[in-house]
């Protein structure tokens, strides 16, 4: 479970207060990036996680940043979250924020087939920019409340995520379904990845014996 305080720089959107006196100091900082096609609900997911508020009107985002200090699995962390543009005209900005991210929430809408095709391209681009075969990424099928309009089967998305070593969540920003769970899992994935990337600690040198004979005082 997570808990904490939040703040944001979203234009015209509600802001949370800064960390309160009861919030533990963060022991770690993670830069998380929310990516996906236009209109899939990236901002709605982010604001619901940050401020427990559902944004119903679609307002195309250029770039908004938020901060949340929370505790995941008993460990306090500062999350710097970047909500990115999904519109094609802002595609040139993608590689810039991909270079800075420690982990990615890859979002499509279950009622939008094209957005699912888009996440495959974004996944490939992230690995290319990072020059890695693997990276901390969580796949989210948003708008699960629109089940009757579904265009992407759950089994299809699950198969795609499993083949690329990602955890998959079907979420709804409107219902606050699996919103916290997706972000918390991304934090866990980032932690695990960073632990694996750390170089092993050098073995401690054995203590040398001084070679002197023990003395007995009479």
Swiss-Prot record:
A motif (Effector region) lies at residues 58-66. GO terms for biological process: cell migration; face morphogenesis; leukocyte differentiation; negative regulation of Schwann cell migration; positive regulation of angiogenesis; positive regulation of endothelial cell migration; positive regulation of endothelial cell-matrix adhesion via fibronectin; positive regulation of vasculogenesis. Pfam families: Ras (PF00071). Its EC number is 3.6.5.2. PROSITE patterns: RAS (PS51421). The modification Cysteine methyl ester is found at residue 215. Keywords: Cell membrane, GTP-binding, Hydrolase, Lipoprotein, Membrane, Methylation, Nucleotide-binding, Palmitate, Prenylation. Residues 216-218 form a propeptide. The keyword Cell membrane applies. It is a lipid-anchor. Residues 7-20 have a biased composition (Gly residues). InterPro entries: P-loop_NTPase (IPR027417), Small_GTP-bd (IPR005225), Small_GTPase (IPR001806), Small_GTPase_Ras-type (IPR020849). GTP binds at residues 36-44, 83-87, 142-145, 172-174. Coiled coil: none annotated. S-palmitoylated by ZDHHC19, leading to increased association with membranes and with rafts/caveolae as well as enhanced cell viability. PANTHER family: RAS, DI-RAS, AND RHEB FAMILY MEMBERS OF SMALL GTPASE SUPERFAMILY (PTHR24070). This is Ras-related protein R-Ras. It comes from Rattus norvegicus (Rat).
């Amino acid at each position: 479970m997570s808990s904490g305080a939040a703040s944001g720089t979203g234009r015209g959107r509600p802001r949370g207060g800064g960390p309160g006196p009861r919030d533990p100091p963060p022991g770690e900082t993670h830069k998380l990036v929310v990516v996906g096609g236009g209109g899939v609900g990236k901002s709605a997911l982010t604001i619901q996680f940050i401020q427990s508020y559902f944004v119903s009107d679609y307002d195309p985002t250029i770039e908004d940043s938020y901060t949340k200090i929370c505790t995941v699995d008993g460990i306090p962390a500062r999350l710097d979250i970047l909500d990115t543009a999904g519109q094609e005209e802002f595609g040139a900005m993608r590689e810039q924020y991909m270079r800075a991210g420690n982990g990615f929430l890859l979002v499509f809408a279950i009622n939008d087939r094209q957005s699912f095709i888009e996440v495959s391209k974004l996944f490939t681009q992230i690995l290319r920019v990072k020059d890695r075969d693997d990276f901390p990424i969580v796949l989210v099928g948003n708008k699960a409340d629109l089940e009757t309009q579904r265009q992407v089967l759950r089994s299809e998305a699950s198969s795609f995520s499993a083949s690329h070593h990602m955890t998959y969540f079907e979420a709804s920003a409107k219902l606050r379904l699996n919103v916290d769970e997706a972000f918390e899992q991304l934090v866990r994935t980032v932690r695990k990845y960073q632990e694996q990337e750390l170089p092993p600690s050098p073995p401690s040198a054995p203590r040398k014996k001084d070679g002197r004979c023990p003395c007995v005082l009479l």
